[in-house]
Each structure stands twice: as structure tokens, then as C-alpha cells.
From Swiss-Prot:
One of its GO terms (biological process) is aerobic respiration. This is NADH-quinone oxidoreductase subunit H. InterPro entries: NADH_UbQ_OxRdtase_su1/FPO, NADH_UbQ_OxRdtase_su1_CS. The chain crosses the membrane at residues 16-36, 88-108, 123-143, 157-177, 202-222, 264-284, 285-305, 325-345. It comes from Azoarcus sp. (strain BH72).
Length: 349
């Protein structure tokens, strides 16, 4: 430790690495929870303006205290256990749903050298951790011992597994181009090439050569997070609120925290993998975290715009899109990218 942290490190002695890691975790999780809270307000405001409404504007100036009021309300509400539910698993379900969306942030780089765990197999770690989110939904649906939660859980399991396959193939294309599983190296690999030398850095990012994979990954991310128009998991007209029917209070809030945390995670990963992360779009502007934040906010706006614009898809249409369209397209594009990399026409040489 250098500078002002050295006296603190000496104070804690051998336990300092553990304390330092815990401090870094808090430094990531605390702002994330704040972003999740105000993303709910942003969603209501954005959709309100799209529908020529005002949105929340009563609690605090311009409604800025609305997320705090909602959080206090859910915190004070009683958690009701259905008489036929398995109480232990009933509580474990929301925790299992939220935990992977928080753990995945360990390998996400926010700037050059600014990452909690600089893991060489970061991409593989992300695939492994994010695939566990479905277990929380399944456990919640089964533990509720009710038909609507169980149907919603089965829908969620099928949908999330289906779109994980196409997301995985899209990530293989990123791996082929960058030749690395380390997320920081993937970002840095997008900061070189012919377009970068010309000062047009945004044309050297992965979104251009992998445009079909960029679109597939983004749409699959919306489906993976069970957001509209892929929200048949909690289709109000059919199964009320899906796997969350029997939940109330903070147990119910944990599912919403998981959903919005996953939205932010998918958005920042899209920015890191396809949009150059913290890299500046043009050569004369400096790189920095502000570019990553701006790109992530833009992807989040697409999530909100999709919810306000598109009607809910039918369940069989969602499955058909995943298995009969996205998976064949991604398989073909993996082969195309592999052949392209070995050809003299490759733009990465």
C-alpha cells in the first residue's frame, strides 16, 4: 500500500488484505444499490414521458425521494409465509436470485486497472455465475407450493437457459477477436487497429465487425433478465406475477433488486465487450470511467424504451426466436469470424 493507506494497512497488519477486499466490495455494492433504486425512478419517468405523462413527482423535489419511500414501505411490510410453503426454501429463493447478480461484478473493469478481481478467466467466470440466477427463481416457484409461481418458475428456467446459449456463442466471437478471457484485455484490444490510428476509435470497437452478435447479445440480455417484451415469466394476464405471487415485503423487494441489478450488469457488460468500455470514441478525447457510464446509461435506455414500446411476446414465439433464429445465427457467425480472422482480409491484422 502506498500513500495515505499505508498507516491503515499497518494498523490492521496481516488482516489488511481481507479488510481491503471487503472495502472494495462495499465500494461496488453500495453505489450499485443506489443505482438500482434510482433506475426504478428513471424507468417510471422515462416511460411516463413516452406516454405523455409526468411520472412520480410528489415525494421530494421532482419525485427524487420516491425510491427511498418505496424502499421504506417494502422494508416495513410483513413477510407473509403461505401455509403450505416450504419456509426455508421460500426465504432462500430471493437470496439465490440476487447473489449471482452481485458476485458477477467482481470481474467487471470500470477503468484501466480499476477492477475488484483481475481474473484471467473473467469471461468464463461471468458465464458460470450468471447461469446460476435461474436457480433462485426455480426454488422460489417450487417452495411457494402454488400453481402460478410454479408455472412462472418453469417459464423462467426455459427462457433463461435458452437465451444463455446464444449469449455464450456471442461471447465466443468476442473471445476469438480479443484472444483473451480477461475483460480488461478485451477492452484494451478494442483500442487498437486501423480505425483507432485514424482517430475514429469507435469504429475499432467490437460492435462493428460483430454487429449481428452485438444485436443478438443485447436482445438475449433483455430476455435473460425477463424484461419486456420477454416478461412472460410474470405475465399479469396469465399467471399474475409468476414466481413472485406469494412474496411480500423485503423478500419481494429482493427479486426486484435482482432484476434491476441484472439490467445494469447486462448493460455494462455490453459496453465492455462491444462498445470499448472506458475507451474514448475519438482520439482527441481522453479515456475514462465517464465513457463507460455514458455507454451503460445508453444501453439501459434501450431496456426502458423496449418496455414502453413493444407488446409482450407470446411464450412460444420467445422460444422459437431463441432456438430457431438466434442459435443458428450465432453458430454461423462463430464460423464466419474464425474464417475471417485467418483470411488476408481480416481487419484485425
Amino acid at each position: 500500500m502506498e500513500g495515505f493507506l499505508q498507516p491503515v494497512a499497518d494498523l490492521f497488519g496481516p488482516s489488511w488484505p481481507v479488510v481491503w477486499t471487503l472495502l472494495k466490495i462495499v465500494a461496488i455494492v453500495a453505489p450499485l444499490m443506489g443505482c438500482v433504486a434510482y433506475l426504478t425512478l428513471a424507468e417510471r419517468k422515462v416511460i411516463g414521458y413516452m406516454q405523455v405523462r409526468i411520472g412520480p413527482n410528489r415525494v421530494g423535489p421532482f419525485g427524487l425521494l420516491q425510491p427511498i419511500a418505496d424502499g421504506v414501505k417494502l422494508l416495513l411490510k410483513e413477510i407473509i409465509f403461505p401455509s403450505s410453503a416450504s419456509k426455508g426454501l421460500f426465504i432462500v429463493g430471493p437470496i439465490l436470485a440476487l447473489a449471482p447478480s452481485l458476485v458477477a461484478w467482481a470481474v467487471v473493469p470500470f477503468d484501466d486497472g480499476l477492477v475488484l478481481a483481475n481474473v484471467n478467466a473473467g469471461l468464463l467466470f461471468l458465464l458460470a455465475v450468471t447461469s446460476m440466477e435461474v436457480y433462485g427463481v426455480i426454488v422460489a416457484g417450487w417452495a411457494s407450493n402454488s400453481k402460478y409461481p410454479f408455472i412462472g418458475a418453469m417459464r423462467a428456467a426455459a427462457q433463461m437457459v435458452s437465451y444463455e446459449v446464444s449469449m455464450g456463442f456471442a461471447l465466443i466471437c468476442v473471445l476469438l477477436i480479443s484472444s483473451s478471457l480477461n475483460l480488461s484485455e478485451i477492452v484494451n484490444s478494442q483500442g487498437s487497429g486501423r480505425f483507432h490510428d485514424m482517430g475514429l476509435s469507435f469504429l475499432s470497437w467490437n460492435w462493428l465487425p460483430l454487429l449481428p452478435m452485438f444485436v443478438v447479445y443485447l436482445i438475449s440480455g433483455i430476455a435473460e433478465t425477463n424484461r419486456a417484451p420477454f416478461d412472460v415469466v410474470e405475465g399479469e394476464a396469465e399467471i399474475v406475477a409468476g414466481h413472485m405471487v406469494e412474496y411480500s415485503g423485503m423478500a419481494f423487494a429482493l427479486f426486484f433488486l435482482a432484476e434491476y441489478a441484472n439490467m445494469i450488469l447486462v448493460s455494462i457488460l455490453t459496453s465492455v465487450l462491444f462498445l470499448g468500455g472506458w475507451l474514448s470514441p475519438v482520439g482527441f478525447l481522453p479515456d475514462g470511467f465517464h465513457w463507460l457510464a455514458l455507454k451503460t446509461a445508453s444501453i439501459l435506455f434501450i431496456f426502458l424504451w423496449a418496455r414502453a414500446t413493444f407488446p409482450r411476446f407470446r411464450y412460444d414465439h420467445i422460444m422459437r426466436l431463441g432456438w430457431k433464429v438466434f442459435i443458428p445465427v450465432t453458430l454461423v457467425w462463430v464460423v464466419v469470424v474464425a474464417v475471417w480472422l485467418m483470411s488476408p482480409l481480416s481487419i484485425w491484422k
